[in-house]
């Protein structure tokens, strides 16, 4: 056996699982953060927390012979990181509160398991190998159906007193909250209402494509969203004083169109 092959055999390998509202993405990751295997399955969120736990058990059963160093789970919802358990979740996944991933995996397979909120995981990834690398203080925001946040201090997630720090989507703003006014989902609602068309006629991608062609209503909706994002990010900066703010989520596929607008709104 070649030394390189022997090194790979001896390398620590982890089962990595990301639980999203639509898909569960999973695979094997090395101790050097190299993705060795990548797969996915449908979440079927409507079936609830117990069904998702069964999917996780199935994934660990499938991969445990190839990667037995540990199981890492990234998930939506608020996570008690000591217990590895969901203690708050939006209605998207019924009966998700109380889902005990860590206890179940460790008792059943004897493999160490850690569970963390998905936005916090995104923030850690940005610190380890992305836009926040080397920063002393950073904020990660994901902008999608809602708005999630993560504070990183010297590369460590700041969880707060009860593991619910930086839930910025619920931040009060203009008689509403940050994510109701500033998340990407607001775009389709506004454009459809202003054009008096069904919401299903519009997607975020469609809105940005029309905005680039000069559509006034699409540009107005984007500008209003950007204004809200600017105010929210500025408020967070007043409190945290970060060295860098990293934006993620599906909407940032439009970075070339949005970056200058958002930076100007924050200023």
Q: For the regions a protein language model found, what residue spans apply to each?
A:
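Short hydrophobic alpha-helix segments
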Residues: 39-41, 90, 161
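A charged helix-plus-loop insertion that forms the helical arch/lid used to bind
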Residues: 85-98
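A cytosolic small-molecule/anion-sensing beta-strand core signal
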Residues: 30, 75, 153-154
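Short loop/edge segments at beta-strand edges and connector loops
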Residues: 115-119
């Amino acid at each position: 056996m070649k030394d390189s092959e022997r090194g790979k055999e001896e390398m620590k390998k982890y089962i990595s699982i990301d639980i999203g509202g639509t898909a569960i993405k999973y695979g094997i990751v090395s101790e050097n953060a190299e993705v060795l295997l990548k797969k996915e399955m449908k979440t079927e969120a409507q079936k609830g927390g117990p069904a998702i736990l069964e999917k996780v058990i199935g994934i660990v059963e499938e991969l445990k012979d190839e990667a037995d160093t540990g199981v890492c789970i990234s998930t939506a919802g608020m996570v008690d990181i000591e217990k590895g358990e969901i203690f708050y979740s939006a209605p998207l996944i019924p009966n998700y509160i109380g889902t005990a991933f860590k206890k179940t995996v460790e008792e059943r397979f004897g493999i160490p398991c850690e569970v963390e909120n998905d936005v916090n995981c995104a923030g850690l990834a940005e610190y380890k190998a992305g836009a926040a690398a080397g920063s002393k203080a950073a904020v990660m925001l994901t902008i999608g159906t809602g708005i999630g946040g993560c504070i990183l201090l010297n590369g460590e997630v700041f969880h707060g007193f009860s593991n619910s720090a930086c839930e910025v989507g619920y931040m009060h703003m203009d008689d509403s909250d940050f994510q109701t006014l500033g998340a990407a989902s607001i775009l389709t609602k506004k454009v459809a209402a202003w054009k008096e068309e069904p919401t299903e006629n519009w997607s975020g991608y469609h809105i940005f494509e029309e905005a680039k062609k000069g559509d006034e209503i699409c540009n107005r909706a984007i500008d209003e969203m950007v204004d809200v994002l600017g105010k929210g990010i500025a408020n967070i900066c007043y409190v945290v004083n970060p060295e860098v703010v990293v934006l993620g989520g599906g909407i940032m596929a439009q970075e070339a169109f949005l970056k200058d607008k958002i930076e100007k709104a924050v200023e």
